[in-house]
């Protein structure tokens, strides 16, 4: 018999780095979840932009079960068919010529930064080690990636941090230009800052970074962990902008809920990563790559990408209608199905409170800092689920505006 557990057990047994919602989801189907008490939620959080095809998608379950009935793991001393097939699909669909598989976005970014440093050291010299990143970015929780993230809240307790990382202002080319020089080995940037507030880069900013990197022989890394795999209405956001990076990192939606990450790059840059320079025990696991291969098959189609753009319009229209009623947002921004509602000054700092009220109303949303409510739903969310979920979100806004919720 299974052990009966409650939300209170989390506080008793788990390391307290999270404060989960007061309910425990136990079942999902499409863009709906149900908790232990049977309450239904429309899921506009998507596991933080992970569940790109919703919960328990039949094709993903079939791919997972088929591979699970064969074998689960061998380690990196052997390759496997699902990993090779997925690598070829990613290469055929992007600028990349080489792929490194891992288990998360943080690991993919760690690999990208290590590759950039090694390439610069091998081709130029050890003095070329500088990394330029951006304030309020998020690249993961390893010591290297959290240092690149530019959010002191996440890194200040873990000093000394890796050196030679400097942070420019996002969407400010002059700020970046002042830091990028001949000692810079890499520039790492999110095409849309997700955790930093759902802020899309401008075309001029990304194009300018491309030109600065070319001028100073630095590698341009696009962190597409959150924007990748169809989220913005293109398979990867660099395609939306028409700016090609030297290295791209991807995770989250790539596995549709099954943990996987990948670093994509060219043959020239990959060539410096010789046997033993980097590795991972689980990266390229056949279970993960079998599922991810099916995710790509479904998402990398014109129909799916056109659908994301149409759903974007539906969200924007309804969110604008909600804002006309309640006047809570100063801006609604984002690309595709990564959207952020920026709170007006009178509601500043209450994004978490709105998310909590939304859950009470039966819809799950995210935050991006204290002032932005974030939406990252499944890419195949239905029109009915959009309508129902945003009706519930409107109810949460109404309750908050009426004073039915408090910061306590």
UniProtKB/Swiss-Prot annotation:
Pathway per the UniProt entry: Amino-acid degradation; L-arginine degradation via AST pathway; L-glutamate and succinate from L-arginine: step 3/5
Sites of N6-(pyridoxal phosphate)lysine modification: 252
Protein family (similarity comment): Belongs to the class-III pyridoxal-phosphate-dependent aminotransferase family. AstC subfamily.
GO biological process: alpha-amino acid biosynthetic process; arginine catabolic process to glutamate; arginine catabolic process to succinate; ornithine catabolic process
Gene name for this UniProt entry: astC
Keywords, sorted A to Z: Aminotransferase, Arginine metabolism, Pyridoxal phosphate, Transferase
Protein role: Catalyzes the transamination of N(2)-succinylornithine and alpha-ketoglutarate into N(2)-succinylglutamate semialdehyde and glutamate. Can also act as an acetylornithine aminotransferase.
Protein name: Succinylornithine transaminase
A GO molecular-function annotation: identical protein binding
InterPro entries with a match to the protein in the record: Ac/SucOrn_transaminase_bac, AcOrn/SuccOrn_fam, Aminotrans_3, Aminotrans_3_PPA_site, Class-III_PLP-dep_AT, PyrdxlP-dep_Trfase, PyrdxlP-dep_Trfase_major, PyrdxlP-dep_Trfase_small
Enzymatic reactions: N(2)-succinyl-L-ornithine + 2-oxoglutarate = N-succinyl-L-glutamate 5-semialdehyde + L-glutamate
Enzyme class: transferase
């Amino acid at each position: 018999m299974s052990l009966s557990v409650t939300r209170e057990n989390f506080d008793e047994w788990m390391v307290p780095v999270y404060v989960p919602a007061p309910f425990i989801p136990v079942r999902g189907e499409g863009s709906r979840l149900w908790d232990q008490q049977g309450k239904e939620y429309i899921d506009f959080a998507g596991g933080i932009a992970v569940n790109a095809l919703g919960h328990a998608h039949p094709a993903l379950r079939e791919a997972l079960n088929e591979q699970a009935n064969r074998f689960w793991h061998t380690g990196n001393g052997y390759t496997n068919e699902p990993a090779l097939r997925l690598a070829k699909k990613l290469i055929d669909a992007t600028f990349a010529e080489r792929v490194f598989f891992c288990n998360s976005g943080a690991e993919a970014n760690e690999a990208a930064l290590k590759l950039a440093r090694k390439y610069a050291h091998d081709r130029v010299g050890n003095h070329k080690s500088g990394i330029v990143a951006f304030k309020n970015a998020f690249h993961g929780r390893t010591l290297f990636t959290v240092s690149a993230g530019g959010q002191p809240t996440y890194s200040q307790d873990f000093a000394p941090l890796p050196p030679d990382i400097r942070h420019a202002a996002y969407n400010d080319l002059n700020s970046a230009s002042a830091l990028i020089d001949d000692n810079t080995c890499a520039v790492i940037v999110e095409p849309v800052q997700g955790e930093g507030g759902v802020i899309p880069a401008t075309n001029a900013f990304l194009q300018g970074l491309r030109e600065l990197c070319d001028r100073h022989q630095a590698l341009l890394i696009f962190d597409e962990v959150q924007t990748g795999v169809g989220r913005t209405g293109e398979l990867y956001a660099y395609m939306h902008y028409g700016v090609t990076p030297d290295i791209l990192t991807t995770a989250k939606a790539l596995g549709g809920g099954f943990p996987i990450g990948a670093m994509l790059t060219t043959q020239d840059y990959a060539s410096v990563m010789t046997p033993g320079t980097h590795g991972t025990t689980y990266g390229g696991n056949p279970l993960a790559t079998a599922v991810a291969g099916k995710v790509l098959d479904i998402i990398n189609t014109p129909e799916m990408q056109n659908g994301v753009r149409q759903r974007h319009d539906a969200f924007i229209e309804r969110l604008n209608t909600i804002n006309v009623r309640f006047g809570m947002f100063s801006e609604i921004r984002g690309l595709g199905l990564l959207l952020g509602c920026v709170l007006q000054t009178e509601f500043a700092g209450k994004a978490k409170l709105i998310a909590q009220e939304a859950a009470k109303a039966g819809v799950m949303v995210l935050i991006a800092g204290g002032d932005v409510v974030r939406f990252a739903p499944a890419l195949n969310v239905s029109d009915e689920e959009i309508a129902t979920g945003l009706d519930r979100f409107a109810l949460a806004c109404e309750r908050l505006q009426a004073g039915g919720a408090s910061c306590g």
